[in-house]
Design a protein with these regions (language model features):
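Short beta-strands and strand-coil junctions in structured, solvent-facing domains, enriched
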Residues: 21-25, 92, 96-97, 177-178, ...
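M16/insulysin-pitrilysin zinc metalloprotease superfamily fold
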Residues: 43-48, 72-106
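M16/MPP (pitrilysin/insulinase) zinc-metallopeptidase core fold and M16-derived inactive scaffolds
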Residues: 15-81, 116, 136-140
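Buried hydrophobic packing residues in well-ordered domains
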Residues: 16, 35-37, 57, 70, ...
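Acidic/histidine-enriched alpha-helical segments
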Residues: 50, 54-59, 94-112, 123, ...
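Mature N-terminal segment immediately following signal peptide/propeptide cleavage
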Residues: 1-15
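An aromatic/glycine/proline-enriched structural segment found at the starts
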Residues: 139, 168-230
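Scaffold signal of the M16-like zinc-metallopeptidase fold and its non-catalytic homologs
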Residues: 44, 82, 89, 114-164, ...
Length: 230
């Protein structure tokens, strides 16, 4: 945890990140599970449904988001409550059945469009040219793989990848390091890592041969060139 005291205004901003790499951590056959999980954090927690959770945030005029990157911005007087809500959402998301079905469908539709986009196809062509066969980055999320993911797999992925030993929290604002530590330990202190620490570092990339790829884009008004040297 990093704390920077700043008395400029009576506010506190909390930003955190859980180090992860979905290319390495996603189980085989579950491509898309990370994207579905990310879309479910806005549906409340195990103790507060979506509307109740949003009301709790509105009551203290806080802006909050949860996921592998998480944050809350709040007035100093509501700092403890803001961190409490953030921790509840981050560690105990509701992951409800009905919301899962909605988010899964939305994710599948989004992926279907993304796979056809010139930007994605250009990026994919570069990856195929630069990376060896079997490289984790070459794993591809498809509408079919998204539709195969189950809610239990989403819950298991959350439990396996959200770990305190891979998390950094930065707090900036009208708060001392001692105050910040007390609050964070109160609401995040019970968070424990379970199982071996996952590998989040991609393998080294071997030398590759020169190559070129052409990606068509019917809507482009001119050609563009993307050089890539590795």
């Amino acid at each position: 945890m990093i704390v920077k005291t700043d008395r400029t205004s009576p506010t506190v901003s909390v930003a955190g990140a859980v180090k992860h790499n979905s290319d390495l951590e996603t189980p085989a056959g579950e491509e898309g599970v990370s994207e579905i999980l990310d879309g479910l954090f806005s549906y409340g927690t195990k103790t507060l449904d979506r509307l109740a959770f949003q009301k709790a945030l509105d009551d203290i005029a806080a802006n909050e988001s949860a996921g592998f990157s998480f944050s809350v911005n709040v007035l100093k007087e509501h700092f403890p409550r803001g961190v409490e809500l953030l921790a509840d959402n981050e560690l105990h998301p509701a992951l409800p059945d009905k919301a899962f079905a909605v988010v899964q469908h939305q994710t599948a539709d989004y992926v279907a469009g993304e796979l056809q986009s010139p930007g994605y196809r250009t990026s994919r062509a570069l990856d195929l040219a630069l990376l060896p066969a079997g490289d984790p980055v070459l794993r591809q999320t498809t509408p079919a793989s998204v539709k195969k993911v189950t809610l239990d797999e989403v819950k298991q992925y959350h439990a396996a990848t959200f770990r305190p030993d891979l998390t950094t929290i930065v707090i900036i604002g009208d708060v001392t390091p001692e105050e910040a530590r007390t609050v964070v330990e109160k609401w995040f202190g019970a968070w424990k890592a379970v199982g071996p620490r996952p590998d989040t570092t991609l393998p080294a990339i071997p030398r590759n041969k020169p190559s070129a790829a052409n990606v068509s884009d019917a809507e482009a008004v001119q050609d563009s060139v993307t050089p890539y040297i590795l």
